[in-house]
Amino acid sequence: VGFKAGVKDYKLTYYTPDYETKDTDILAAFRVTPQPGVPPEEAGAAVAAESSTGTWTTVWTDGLTSLDRYKGRCYHIESVAGEENQYIAYVAYPLDLFEEGSVTNMFTSIVGNVFGFKALRALRLEDLRIPPAYTKTFQGPPHGIQVERDKLNKYGRPLLGCTIKPKLGLSAKNYGRAVYECLRGGLDFTKDDENVNSQPFMRWRDRFLFCAEAIYKAQAETGEIKGHYLNATAGTCEEMIKRAVFARELGVPIVMHDYLTGGFTANTSLAHYCRDNGLLLHIHRAMHAVIDRQKNHGMHFRVLAKALRLSGGDHIHAGTVVGKLEGEREITLGFVVLLRDDFVEKDRSRGIYFTQDWVSIPGVLPVASGGIHVWHMPALTEIFGDDSVLQFGGGTLGHPWGNAPGAVANRVALEACVRARNEGRDLAREGNEIIREASKWSLELAAACEVWKEIKFDFEAMDTL
């Protein structure tokens, strides 16, 4: 007897409300907006089918395998409160659908062709549950939070950084000079901007050399370990690794990668190199808003953050809550705990759809960067806590007296906030007063307070629950 050819509804095969999820399943929560006339069960089943074993018609080769073993299943659908014709579809994928240790392969299935599917008006991946059985196939961050603190010998406070500006156009020597001034003033790190790679005005090798000189000079003067995120992102993986090798030969502590524009395969390769060679890895998320900013289509940043923790990175930019870039407080804190903690409970108030157990994968330091200055320091210290990197680009280099005084102002403000917190003061309520008190003892901080006293970026956050 021949097989039964023809087209049948996805929901007959892929919508299984009685399915009990397994501990080894990868679980996904999709925000589905079906086309008019398409029932939610059919839309959810279509997502499960098209992101796993299904295609638009029955094919005779289905008989050569066990679809029951390999198919994705839509096991639950709930409507989204306050939205018409929008649903959260929960899909379970058997572990065997995915190559071990490959974020690239996981995403090619789960967020591949299905996002262009005609029966859906829009589709957004809100969250993923990565089971320990799959997590253990990844190396994860090259070093993690504790190893980084031990390497740098810095404890009990957030780390301070600064992106060198103007981001494009400086010569390598002037760039190195700016790095030196910031590190000498009291910052822990300076940073290449994400789009600084190897342009005609400043080739990568020259920049690496002058930055290394700046690091060593600042370390000698301050007695503290310093670093500069040398951006190894390049047009090919081979060139990227070549740059990381040169950084290692210079003896610097950290390199950097733009993981979304560079791609997950390149990122994982670099993370492996960094662990093998004792380099920390700073991750910039350039391009994330293309993927995550629309509420009804794309992929939420918490998924990109989880993917980065698997692929590997020791720092990642995670919004500021208070600065110039997008980030609502509870949602930002949601992916901050997903980056740092070993075990994260489901918490829908923070947008966390699944309990996530990271087993032995190290944590990632969230980086707050973008439009922040000394008046934000109390809020940042309270929101992000000690295990974070606070990055002030304009908030350092924009100081009226120059880079080193700008760095001094930030370091004094941070030390004042940490001390006040440790003494039991309420940073949220007394923040401005704490900064004012500290500025009496630091002319640099007083000047910074004066310049930025009125600056605010007040817009509604797009990324709401």
Swiss-Prot record:
Major location (coarse): plastid
Record: active site: K165, H284
Single biological process term from Gene Ontology: reductive pentose-phosphate cycle
Post-translational modifications: The disulfide bond which can form in the large chain dimeric partners within the hexadecamer appears to be associated with oxidative stress and protein turnover.
Residues at the site labelled Transition state stabilizer: K324
Pfam families found in the cross-reference section: RuBisCO_large, RuBisCO_large_N
Cofactor annotation comment: Binds 1 Mg(2+) ion per subunit.
SUPFAM superfamilies named among the record's database cross-references: RuBisCo, C-terminal domain, RuBisCO, large subunit, small (N-terminal) domain
GO cellular component term of the entry, any: chloroplast
Cellular localisation: Plastid, Chloroplast
Binding site for Mg(2+): K191, D193, E194
Modified residues (N6,N6,N6-trimethyllysine): K4
Record GO terms (molecular function): magnesium ion binding; monooxygenase activity; ribulose-bisphosphate carboxylase activity
Cofactor requirement: Mg(2+)
Residues that bind substrate: N113, T163, K167, R285, H317, S369
CDD domains in the cross-refs: RuBisCO_large_I
EC number assigned by the record: 4.1.1.39
Presence of keyword Ribosomal protein: no
Enzyme superclass (EC): lyase
InterPro entries, alphabetized: RuBisCO, RuBisCo_large_chain_AS, RuBisCO_lsu_C, RuBisCO_lsu_C_sf, RuBisCO_lsu_fd_N, RuBisCO_lsu_N_sf, RuBisCO_lsuI
Catalytic reaction equation(s): 2 (2R)-3-phosphoglycerate + 2 H(+) = D-ribulose 1,5-bisphosphate + CO2 + H2O; D-ribulose 1,5-bisphosphate + O2 = 2-phosphoglycolate + (2R)-3-phosphoglycerate + 2 H(+)
Note: The basic functional RuBisCO is composed of a large chain homodimer in a 'head-to-tail' conformation. In form I RuBisCO this homodimer is arranged in a barrel-like tetramer with the small subunits forming a tetrameric 'cap' on each end of the 'barrel'.
Family: Belongs to the RuBisCO large chain family. Type I subfamily.
Subunit note: Heterohexadecamer of 8 large chains and 8 small chains; disulfide-linked. The disulfide link is formed within the large subunit homodimers.
Role noted for this protein: RuBisCO catalyzes two reactions: the carboxylation of D-ribulose 1,5-bisphosphate, the primary event in carbon dioxide fixation, as well as the oxidative fragmentation of the pentose substrate in the photorespiration process. Both reactions occur simultaneously and in competition at the same active site.
Protein name according to UniProt: Ribulose bisphosphate carboxylase large chain
Species: Senega cruciata (Cross-leaved milkwort)
